[in-house]
Swiss-Prot record:
Transmembrane feature ranges: 7-29, 68-88, 101-121, 139-159
Primary localisation category: membrane
Compartments reported by the entry: Cell projection, Cilium membrane; Cell membrane
Domain of life (superkingdom): Eukaryota
Functional summary from the UniProt entry: Acts as a negative regulator of hedgehog signaling probably by promoting internalization and subsequent degradation of smoothened protein (SMO) present in the ciliary membrane. Plays a role in sonic hedgehog (SHH)-induced spinal neural progenitor cells differentiation.
Full protein name: Modulator of smoothened protein
Gene Ontology cellular component annotations, sorted alphabetically: ciliary membrane; Golgi apparatus; plasma membrane
Length: 167
């Protein structure tokens, strides 16, 4: 196993972890206000009302966000399989070729999720329009983690494809 394969495996693992963390954390969209702060995630929605304890419930997701969640889960599975194949490539060199294609599929799934997610900004909890959040609302840390997972996946693919050769 060469250095570029190890680097790409580490990048795919980091992307996988960031994508899992982005789903687990309910901060995809944040109203940002201290009084009645609302954070909306893909699996949880949390609200803090006037300094009380934070209350979290499972949201009723619009079809666009269900599709986003589905694509992210498939992307996570793809990256997990890719990491496994890169470990196997230590003994069977041809596994690297399959790992690259599966990682590419994961990147496409993540990019599709990133394109579809903003279409759901119209829901009542957010109050925006597709691809346009209201002024008092921002994307949260979970969305940033998800974008980082896309970035690490793309850079990992560059290393796996030996596009980023040193020197």
């Amino acid at each position: 196993m060469d250095k570029l394969t190890i680097i790409s495996g580490c990048l795919f693992l980091a992307a996988d972890i960031f994508a899992i963390a982005s789903i687990a954390n309910p901060d995809w969209i944040n109203t940002g206000g201290q009084e009645g702060a609302l954070t909306v995630g893909l699996v949880k929605q949390c609200q803090t009302i006037h300094g009380r304890n934070r209350i979290c419930v499972s949201p009723s997701l619009p079809p666009e966000w269900v599709t986003t969640l589905f694509f992210i889960i498939l992307g996570i599975v793809s990256l997990t399989i890719t990491c496994g194949l890169l470990v196997i490539s230590h003994w069977r060199r041809e596994a690297t070729k399959y790992a690259r294609w599966i990682a590419f599929m994961g990147m496409v799934l993540f990019c599709m999720a990133a394109l579809i997610f903003p279409v759901g900004f119209y829901i009542n909890q957010v109050g925006g329009q597709p691809y346009k959040l209201p002024n008092n609302t921002v994307v949260g840390s979970s969305y940033v983690l998800f974008v980082l997972s896309i970035f690490f996946t793309i850079v990992g693919l560059l290393f796996a494809g030996k596009v980023c050769l040193p020197g």
